[in-house]
A protein has these predicted regions:
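Short, small/polar residue-rich loop motifs at catalytic or cofactor-binding pockets
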Residues: 279, 400-403, 468-470
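Glycine-rich phosphate/pyrophosphate-binding beta-alpha loops
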Residues: 293-302, 404-407, 417-430, 488-495
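Noncatalytic scaffold domains of N-terminal-nucleophile
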Residues: 29-63, 67, 75-76, 80-239, ...
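Internal maturation/activation junctions in enzymes
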Residues: 314-421, 431, 442, 574
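Bacterial N-terminal signal peptides
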Residues: 11-23
Length: 584
């Protein structure tokens, strides 16, 4: 049965909860997943609210957003507050030293903002090749300034606030300023990740901030203050985003990147000054009676999610319910989607991405016809999408890791789905004097430049944005009204996490908490991956009889989902992480 907390019980008496259809959870709640290392599960209750809601990766961040909404702020206002607090309390995942994608619904229009990091002007395709011409080892590339892309999060937050904000800019920054000055308690998750971290102590500023004099991670509950970050935020509050991209903060970023002792980068002040956020059309596609909308290239996430759903559209997923048959179809659909993603998707300023063709219902029906209900296809080949002529590219080997996600709905029905990142856990493992970690986003590019005699679409190029798997998603119902806001961190696994959750919400009609906590499953066009330590392990034998190469792996999703009902809002925060879904 679903565990319901005090808030739920108090609302039952008001007749609120009775109108919300719920399904019992299908699975146990065991141990958790990667690319950020797993730190265990925490039992969660379904979030319930009547006016507005925030689902985010840390209770302090969610509470900051909730308070902004209670003060009359918009979903965009709340997103600024949530992101800046996350920079403090979940520094391993996101922050102003990184980038983000935002999908915004204003009740009539869907807009996306691309705050993805960019390669410096000096970057070359061979950036991550060693002296022998072979790709560098991943962490040899990650640690240091070489992997740092020009951050986009601050520009994105300012752009969203200018376009959709209601409260003053200073007011939405204030919760993070107060927390940075007065301190916050180190959470078990942050402490656990610091304990597993191998490289962060090599940076003097990070070592002094996160570790004690003996080199041990500061203990759970230790109050951590960040006066340097507080000053950075006050500067941004007074002068806006320009103060990040020019002046002292910009110089601090450049110095930190270029002065790394063993792996310096080549970012310049001009790289920062020239950064712009791109407003792009949302990618929307049908699934059952719903419209699924999200971010287009340079993100591959929404294209791949819609490819998976387009294949599943041909099947009665509702009658399957969670089990080996559903996993077979979701995994085979994932193989097809990842095959296309690896070949076609990159920064649209550099590559003609055939978005219309890849998401065309006819094309997806033809891809679905390749699925044998009784046998896995193994490794799928890319398709040939219609409508757009595209250059022949080589497949990409880009590696992708962790992030954070927030879902927000305000009392006017506006919604934010925002996935935000510094890429790997703790990014490039370098901290600025301004109080924040820098990203290692450039390792999201392919390390190789040519495959099969063809240039790789996602290779490094000057000013280019690396391909992403982030899939912030907003779902509209058949009447074009807001129905759900969904997203997750998790590197390339994000695509499967979001697809699984959408099937749980839309086909199996699960409560968002239950949908988030479903075992993670799928394929990235390699093995069929089942989440270790969950009920999914029992499906391994049945899948192997269909020819699946099954791997049991940790899958550390951080799904945050909100569903709109006639009576209000219900939300879920993945039990694998420490987030919450709360509202007013």
């Amino acid at each position: 049965m679903i565990v319901r907390g005090p808030l739920w019980r108090s609302l039952v008496g008001l007749g609120f909860a009775a109108s919300i259809p719920l399904a019992a959870p299908a699975f146990a709640q065991p141990v958790a997943p990667s690319p950020e290392a797993p730190t265990g599960r925490t039992a969660k209750t379904t979030g319930v609210a009547t006016k507005d809601m925030v689902a985010a990766a840390n209770p302090l961040a969610a509470q900051a957003g909730r308070e902004i909404l209670a003060a009359g702020g918009s979903a965009a206002d709340a997103a600024v507050a949530v992101q800046l607090v996350l920079n403090l309390v979940e520094p391993q995942s996101s922050g102003i030293g990184g980038g983000a994608f935002m999908v915004f619904w204003d009740g009539t229009a869907m807009t996306t903002l691309d705050g993805r990091e960019k390669a410096p002007a000096a970057a070359k395709p061979e950036r991550f090749l060693g002296s022998d011409g072979k790709p560098m080892k991943f962490y040899d590339a990650v640690v240091g300034g070489r992997s740092v892309g020009v951050p986009g999060t601050v520009r994105l937050l300012e752009a969203a606030h200018k376009k959709w904000g209601k409260l003053p800019w200073k007011q939405v920054i204030e919760p993070a300023v107060n927390l940075a000055e007065n301190g916050f308690a180190i959470s078990p998750r942050l402490n656990g990740l610091l304990s597993q971290e191998k490289y962060l102590q090599n940076d003097p500023l990070a070592r002094a901030y996160f570790y004690d004099a003996e080199g041990k991670p500061k203990a759970v509950g230790t109050v951590l203050k960040n006066p340097a970050f507080a000053q950075t935020l006050r500067t941004l509050a007074d002068k806006g985003a320009d103060a990040f991209y020019t002046g002292e903060i910009a110089q601090d970023i450049v110095t930190t990147v270029t002065s790394h002792a063993t792996n310096p980068g080549d970012m310049t002040l001009d790289d920062l000054k020239s950064y712009v956020v791109e407003e792009r059309p949302a990618i929307c596609g049908p699934y059952r009676v719903y419209k699924i909308c999200g971010m287009g290239p340079p993100s591959s996430g929404q294209i791949a999610v819609q490819e998976i759903l387009g294949v599943l559209e041909t099947q009665d997923m509702a009658s399957m319910k969670p089990g080996p048959e559903a996993v077979h179809w979701i995994s085979e659909a994932g193989r097809l989607a990842f095959a296309d993603r690896g070949l076609y998707v990159a920064d649209p300023a550099f590559v003609n991405v055939p978005v219309k063709g890849l998401t065309d219902p006819g094309y997806l029906k033809s891809r679905a016809a390749l699925v044998d209900p009784n046998k896995s296809m193994g490794k799928a080949k890319p398709g040939e999408p219609p409508f757009q002529k595209t250059f022949l590219w080589g497949p990409s080997d880009g590696i992708e890791y962790g992030t954070s996600h927030m879902s927000i709905v305000d009392r006017n029905g506006n919604a934010v789905s925002m996935t935000t990142t510094i890429e790997d856990g703790f990014g490039a493992r370098i901290m600025t004097k301004s109080g924040f970690l820098l990203n290692n986003e450039l390792t999201d590019f392919s390390f190789t430049t040519v495959e099969d005699g063809k240039p790789v679409a996602n290779r490094v190029e000057p000013g280019k944005r690396p391909r992403s798997s982030m899939a912030p998603t907003i779902v509209l119902d058949g009447g074009n009204k807001l129905y759900a806001v969904v997203g997750s961190p998790g590197g390339s696994l994000i695509i499967n996490y979001v697809a699984k959750t959408l099937v749980g919400l839309l086909d199996w009609k699960l409560d968002p908490q239950v949908a988030a906590d479903l075992p993670n499953i799928g394929s990235r066009n390699g093995p069929t991956e089942l989440e270790a330590g969950t009920e999914a392990e029992a499906w391994k034998a049945a899948l192997e009889t269909k020819g699946h190469d099954v791997k049991l792996i940790d899958q550390n999703s951080g799904i945050h989902a909100i569903v709109v009902t006639p009576a209000g809002l219900i939300g879920g925060a993945d039990s694998r992480r420490e987030g919450v879904a709360i509202g007013n």
